């Protein structure tokens, strides 16, 4: 089976090909999956959307594609973490993926179920002051 052939409902973690294309920054296949009508809001067993995976993989081009199609910028996974939270964990709140998400209105003060926000996480990791960055 190839990435674009008949798609099973998901792997053992509930991930579908669009999750993987998003994680690995495979814009070509992500675009094909979008064009074929794959559900852009599909979630895995942890409640993570393809945008969560694009954020984790720092896949700016795929994230931009998903955002251009109107996906929810602050979608929460089962722990209350948003794509910006995952991007912050990977980058300490720095880099193009964080800039893209903030530029599309991601909330740096959105608290997860543990009461931690991306801004607080960035500070704890020794990263940038996201509150200042989101205001600029």
Language-model features: where?
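Intrinsically disordered, low-complexity regulatory segments in ankyrin-centric signaling systems
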Residues: 1-35, 136
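Leucine-rich solenoid repeat scaffolds
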Residues: 102, 107-136
């Amino acid at each position: 089976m190839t990435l674009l052939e008949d798609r099973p409902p998901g792997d053992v973690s509930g991930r579908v090909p669009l999750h993987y294309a998003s994680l690995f920054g495979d814009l070509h296949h992500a675009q094909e999956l979008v064009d074929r009508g794959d559900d852009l809001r599909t979630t895995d067993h942890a409640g993570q959307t393809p945008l969560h995976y694009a954020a984790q993989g720092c896949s700016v081009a795929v994230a931009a594609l998903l955002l251009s199609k109107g996906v929810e910028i602050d979608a929460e996974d089962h722990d209350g973490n948003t794509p910006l939270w995952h991007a912050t964990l990977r980058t300490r709140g720095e880099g193009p993926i964080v800039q893209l998400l903030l530029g599309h209105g991601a909330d740096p003060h959105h608290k997860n179920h543990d009461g931690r926000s991306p801004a607080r996480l960035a500070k704890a990791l020794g990263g940038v002051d996201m509150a200042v960055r989101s205001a600029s």
